[in-house]
Regions:
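Structured-RNA-binding interfaces characteristic of tRNA pseudouridine synthases
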Residues: 1-246
Length: 246
């Protein structure tokens, strides 16, 4: 048996998220079906992150074990002939038996894109959060720095997931102005459920003047979800990269 690592890009608009669901289309289901068509095997697929409905990925990672004799690097081409156009395997490699896409990861990079203009673009609505107001990017940048470092982010998670600890480390959080698009890029050692989207919603609230940048440390310390901003819409979020030590 060989352990195969896949690097996957997908547009999440038409899917109910990564995880397999009985009554809805998922990214995992599409990949499992493609693997079955190519190998004739029913496998278990392990994803690095369970992206929600509407969330996209440029660098999602998954792995599975197979007895197939297909060369590891050829899996990408073979699977892409069976996948819908909005899902593509960008790379495939054989990895050590103990590699696990989720548990071997040491960090992730996410990007969130805002579209700041009076009128929403018909071309970018499914990749961005449309914001009509002019945002104070300087205040947002100040607030972003307060999120960096190791903190208890219990106030920046949605209910619905059980975790042993709500402490996470954010290594970098940057805001780039490509008007009318504004991109937030966040790298950390792990993220709680909806953590990136809630941080984004909070930074947008700072940009609108609804929350003061200097209040962010206190909001983090409080652990009170009600003090933060809204959960930003799913469609602006993209999993850019999963980081491994080797």
């Amino acid at each position: 048996m060989r352990n195969i690592k896949l690097t996957i890009s997908y547009k999440g608009t038409a899917y109910a998220g990564w995880q397999f669901q009985k009554n809805a289309h998922s990214i995992e289901e599409a990949l499992l079906d493609a693997i079955h068509q190519v190998t004739g095997e029913v496998v278990k697929l392990y994803g690095a992150g369970r992206t929600d409905a509407g969330v996209h990925a440029q660098g999602q990672v998954a792995n599975f074990t197979t007895a197939s004799r297909i060369p590891p690097e050829r899996f990408a081409l073979a699977l892409n002939t069976k996948l819908p156009r909005d899902i593509r395997v960008m790379e495939s490699h054989q990895v050590p038996e103990d590699f696990h896409s989720r548990y071997s990861a040491v960090g992730k990079i996410y990007a969130y894109t805002l579209y700041t203009a009076p009128i929403e673009s018909p071309f970018y609505w499914d990749y961005t959060w449309h914001i009509r107001e002019v945002l104070d990017l300087r205040a947002m940048d100040t607030a972003a720095r307060a999120f960096c470092g190791e903190h208890d982010f219990r106030g920046f998670m949605s209910t619905g997931s059980a975790v042993k600890s709500t402490v996470r480390r954010i290594d970098t959080l940057t805001i780039e102005d490509h008007s009318p698009e504004i991109q937030l890029t966040i790298q950390g050692n792990g993220f709680l459920y909806n953590m990136v989207r809630i941080i984004t919603g909070t930074l947008v609230a700072v940009g609108m003047g609804k929350i003061k940048a200097e209040d962010i440390p206190g909001i983090i310390e409080s652990g009170d979800r009600e003090q933060g901003g809204i959960t930003a819409p799913a469609q602006g979020l993209m999993l850019k990269k999963v980081i491994y030590s080797q």
